[in-house]
A protein has these predicted regions:
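S-adenosylmethionine
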Residues: 3-156
Length: 158
């Protein structure tokens, strides 16, 4: 995002110290230290409080594979490469997404956008959960680069 949008400042968070270490190497290799801050924390817990309601966009690729699918359908090479923490989204694959719905309104500017990659079999349920909140001006499902429905985009009411 920081490479594609040179005018932006990016705060990236992850629970995994290994993910933060890899992101740090990538950020440094791209010479983005002045615009990309990496924080090892759960969701937005480590983001400075004074930044509340200051973000235009919140992007997340949370663990979204339902536990039963992870155990039965995910190829061994994926499970062997990625830590379970990065894949297992709980019983319905929406555990972290539900938490994002709680914290996103605190972080986003009015009219701000939440973009979340999710398991394609649960996008309708995810959209319904967002719509039930009654605070999103629009909730849409978008395709990923392989033309599969995978991204939920919700715009906070202004």
């Amino acid at each position: 995002i920081a490479t594609e949008r040179p005018q932006t400042r990016v705060y990236a968070t992850d629970l995994s110290s290994k993910a933060i270490a890899l992101a740090t190497r990538n950020r440094d290799a791209l010479d983005l230290q002045d615009r990309v801050e990496l924080i090892e924390c759960d969701l937005v817990e480590g983001v400075p409080a004074e930044l509340a309601q200051s973000f235009s966009v919140l992007v997340s690729n949370p663990p979204y594979i339902p536990t039963s699918v992870l155990e039965q359908e995910v190829p061994a090479e994926v499970k062997g490469f990625e830590p379970k923490l990065a894949l297992d989204g709980g019983e319905d694959g929406l555990d972290v997404y539900k938490r994002l719905l709680e914290v996103a309104p605190r972080m986003l500017l009015p009219g701000g956008m939440l973009c979340v990659e999710l398991y394609e079999g649960h996008l309708d349920k995810a959209a319904h959960l967002a719509e039930e909140q009654g605070i999103w001006e629009s909730v849409e499902v978008k395709e990923d680069l392989t033309h599969r429905p995978r991204i939920l985009v919700a715009c906070l009411a202004k």
